[in-house]
Amino acid sequence: MESPSLPMTAKDWTTTSLHRVFAMQGGEDDLSYVNNSDSQALAITLSKPILISSLQSIKLFSDQTPIKITDLGCATGSNTFTTVDTVVETLQRRYTARCGGGGSPEFEAFFCDLPSNDFNMLFKLLAEKQKVDSPAKYFAGGVAGSFYDRLFPRGTIHVAVSLSALHWLSQIPEKVLEKESRTWNKGKTWIEGAKKEVVEAYAEQSDKDLDDFMSCRKEEMVKGGVLFVLMAGRPSGSSSQFGDQDTRAKHPFTTTMEQAWQDLIEEGLIDEETRDGFNIPAYMRSPEEVTAGIDRCGGFKIGKMDFLKIVEYSDEKQEEWKKDPVSYGRARTNLVQAAIRPMVDAYLGPDLSHELFKRYENRVSTNQEFLHITCFYGVVVFSAIRV
């Protein structure tokens, strides 16, 4: 069968075009990020003490201007609201303790993400939440743009958070898109198990992106402000993107994803070059890489840095899946679609994208081994004070 004309090619993955199509799956159906972000919610819950501790340790801002908070890479759903609530409530308690009931300033929260994010859904959910909270805890606004660029005037942000977002790169490394080079990622759609040159190209892009992120925050934040970041990461000393073999085998971006792409090739729906031109723009940094990036930037003092392991599913849920592998396959496919479906749609087109994820679901549903091994998602979390 002749390969169809595709909407995008490997060379289209410039910063501009990736920003145009990259977003978590919008809406609130079974594929949406809203309904497939439990692991991120658990990571936020486990790291919450680090955020609260950093907010309790800083000197309170003394002027009467509103306290400005931003969530960088907010996506959609309750995770962003939960974290902003934590910031507001923690600081309100401190101001009340110091000044009494009328001593707390007003708060503004800016929800930031790429223009392709589903801001309509985000603010629909926020409006529903604020009806329950009435009166609202803060004034809210949306900012469409990349957190690898400046988003706010100099010295205006008091608290900046970024949750499960900074492992997404600003672009596919240009070297990886050069077909005749050693860095062409042949046979792969990500870097786990890829050639050393491919991994190094991703690491270089990761360092550049982290430098850009930190430099922008350095300009935007007030002295004494808090930067709190949680991102997918890997353990210290691990050359792999993961810390254990089971996670390496079971992670949504690895074995099953590669098999699903290979199925399309073997069925004549796409050719190998089409598969090789698609690369997932994610890199799991180690704590050492994150620390080095903060140090290169200067202007921040690290308060706390930690690596956490987030279990994919509880033991009880795992036992449920063993009895119903078809539902497990569907749930796992929904999870990966929530993260990368918009990007795959843009690359393959909706029809071929649908075929890819059908094969992904079938692979997961029929892999009995997956039901008996545990996958952990690693996260690096840190708090830092603007100095």
Curated annotation (Swiss-Prot):
* Residues holding gibberellin A4: Q40, H167, W168
The protein's matches in Gene3D superfamilies, at most eight in alphabetical order, are given as: Methyltransferase, alpha-helical capping domain, Vaccinia Virus protein VP39
Key word Methyltransferase present? yes
According to the UniProt record, activity depends on pH as follows: Optimum pH is 8.0.
Query: Which cofactors does this protein require?
Result: Mg(2+)
Q: So what does this thing catalyse?
A: gibberellin A4 + S-adenosyl-L-methionine = O-methyl gibberellin A4 + S-adenosyl-L-homocysteine
Q: Which GO terms describe its molecular function?
A: gibberellin A4 carboxyl methyltransferase activity; gibberellin carboxyl-O-methyltransferase activity; metal ion binding; S-adenosylmethionine-dependent methyltransferase activity
> What is expression of this protein induced or repressed by?
Up-regulated by alamethicin, but not by herbivory.
Please tell me where Mg(2+) binds in this chain. Answer: N185, R275, D276, F278, N279
> Short name of one Pfam family for this protein?
Methyltransf_7
* GO terms, biological process: methylation
The knockout outcome noted for this protein's gene is: No visible phenotype, even in gamt1 and gamt2 double mutants.
Q: How is its activity regulated?
A: Down-regulated by Zn(2+), Cu(2+) and Fe(3+). No effect of K(+), NH(4+), Na(+), Ca(2+), Mg(2+), Mn(2+) and Fe(2+).
EC code(s) of this entry: 2.1.1.276
Q: In which tissues is it expressed?
A: Expressed in siliques and germinating seeds. Not detected in leaves, stems, flowers and roots.
Instruction: Give me the residues that bind S-adenosyl-L-homocysteine, please.
Output: Y33, C74, N79, D113, L114, S146, F147
List the keywords (alphabetical).
Magnesium, Metal-binding, Methyltransferase, S-adenosyl-L-methionine, Transferase
Q: Which family does it belong to?
A: Belongs to the methyltransferase superfamily. Type-7 methyltransferase family. SABATH subfamily.
Extra info from the record? Overexpression of GAMT2 results in dwarf phenotype.
What is this protein's function per UniProt? Methylates the carboxyl group of several gibberellins (GAs). Substrate preference is GA4 > GA34 > GA9 > GA3 > GA1 > GA51 > GA20. No activity with diterpenes abietic acid and ent-kaurenoic acid.
Q: Which PANTHER family match?
A: S-ADENOSYL-L-METHIONINE:CARBOXYL METHYLTRANSFERASE FAMILY PROTEIN
Name listed for the protein in its UniProt record: Gibberellic acid methyltransferase 2
**What lineage is on file?**
Eukaryota, Viridiplantae, Streptophyta, Embryophyta, Tracheophyta
